[in-house]
């Protein structure tokens, strides 16, 4: 019975750590860039697009398709960075339970 109580306490502590990690993830922001920094965008931890910055040189007539491609590339860069940060935060929160056989792959 003592082992069960200990296991329950560990599970509750892990649940709190995971909730804290989700809060940290929601607050994070990552920047993605493309075109050598000509396009920058910021994604929130929720995946929401927060900001897009375009270099003024991209505002020239006929650059629309280039701008669109650069925005997509910057978004992909930011999304990759966000996924990496989210996984890192969740692995830290899960502690010894991260990567356990039989556990769902959440991060």
Curated annotation (Swiss-Prot):
Binds to DNA and alters its conformation. May be involved in regulation of gene expression, nucleoid organization and DNA protection. GO terms for cellular component: bacterial nucleoid; cytosol. NCBIfam families: DNA_YbaB_EbfC (TIGR00103), PRK14625.1 (NF011218). It holds the Pfam family YbaB_DNA_bd. This is Nucleoid-associated protein PHZ_c0369. Coiled coil: none annotated. Homodimer. The keyword Cytoplasm applies. It is found in: Cytoplasm, Nucleoid. InterPro entries: YbaB-like_sf, YbaB/EbfC. Belongs to the YbaB/EbfC family. The keyword Signal does not apply. Keywords: Cytoplasm, DNA-binding. One of its GO terms (molecular function) is DNA binding.
């Amino acid at each position: 019975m003592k082992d069960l109580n200990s296991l329950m306490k560990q599970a509750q502590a892990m649940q709190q750590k995971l909730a804290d990690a989700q809060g940290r993830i929601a607050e994070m922001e990552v920047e993605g860039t493309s075109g050598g920094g000509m396009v920058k965008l910021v994604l929130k931890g929720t995946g929401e697009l927060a900001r897009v910055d375009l270099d003024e040189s991209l505002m020239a007539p006929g650059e629309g398709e280039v701008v669109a491609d650069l925005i997509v590339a910057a978004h992909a860069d930011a999304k990759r960075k966000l996924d990496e940060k989210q996984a890192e935060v969740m692995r830290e929160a899960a502690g010894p339970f991260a990567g356990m056989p039989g556990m769902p792959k959440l991060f």
